Design a protein with these regions (language model features):
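Active-site neighborhood of HAD-like aspartate-dependent phosphohydrolases
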Residues: 1-49
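Asp-based, Mg2+/Mn2+-dependent phosphohydrolase catalytic module
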Residues: 2, 64-86, 94-125, 129-183
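Generic enzyme active-site microenvironment
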Residues: 7-9, 51, 126, 168
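Active-site loop signature of alpha/beta-hydrolase-fold enzymes
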Residues: 13-15, 57, 132, 151
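A short alpha-helix capping/helix-coil boundary motif
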Residues: 14-18, 53-55, 87-90, 110-113
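Short acidic, glycine/proline-rich loop/turn micro-motifs
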Residues: 18-22, 60-61, 156-158
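Substrate-recognition element of Asp-dependent hydrolases with the DxDx(T/V) motif
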Residues: 34, 38-71, 84-97, 136
Length: 183
């Protein structure tokens, strides 16, 4: 039986990000400790889902089949570490599309709420960017910032806004703390 849902961003939280986008399986590299963090959450009985902006599709830098291959590599790496990612949702649109699925809009998170039949109140939504945090707030979840990826810059920007959120060095540190808090 699940102990609850944890939602993760992908680039900058699970894997290293690139200003040029992750366009192939060869460019996908996990951040140290991220797969172990996923495994820790899985072993503790949490469902794990990923919500990620992937405008590289809209920019024609990669196609859906390539994105699916990248996700298969990520899923296999998580499984090998002892973790399980149950669902991945993504927004393929350009930032100018005006869709409701591109973070900071809450559409992807609300989709996961429907998929798992759970309200997002109290659900940790882990990201490394201001838009991840804004989406978490808009969806009514519990925003969590990690300092990997764009996290350090985002922490400074969020501090200027006076938004108080939990901040961790990386996904592994969050997972350890969260599992210990929920025992």
């Amino acid at each position: 039986m699940s102990r609850g849902l944890v939602i993760l961003d992908r680039d900058g939280v699970i894997n290293y990000d690139s200003e040029y986008f992750i366009k192939s399986t060869n460019e996908w590299h996990p951040i140290d400790g991220s797969l172990e963090g996923i495994a820790r959450l899985s072993r503790a009985g949490f469902d794990i889902a990923v919500a990620t902006n992937q405008s590289g599709i809209g920019r024609k830098l990669l196609d859906v089949a390539t994105l699916e291959s990248i996700h298969q590599k990520m899923l296999a790496a998580a499984r090998k570490a002892g973790g399980d990612i149950g669902k991945i949702v993504y927004c393929p649109h350009l930032p100018t599309a005006g869709c409701d699925c591109r973070k900071p809009q809450p559409g992807l998170l609300l989709q996961l709420s429907r998929n798992y039949s759970v309200p997002l109140t109290g659900v940790p939504i882990v990201g490394d960017s201001v838009r991840d945090i804004d989406a978490a707030v808009a969806a009514g979840g519990r925003p969590i910032l990690v300092r990997t990826g764009n996290g350090t810059q985002s922490e400074a920007a969020l501090a200027k806004r006076g938004l108080e959120i939990d901040v961790y060095d990386d996904l592994a540190q969050f997972a350890e703390a969260f599992v210990n808090q929920t025992r």
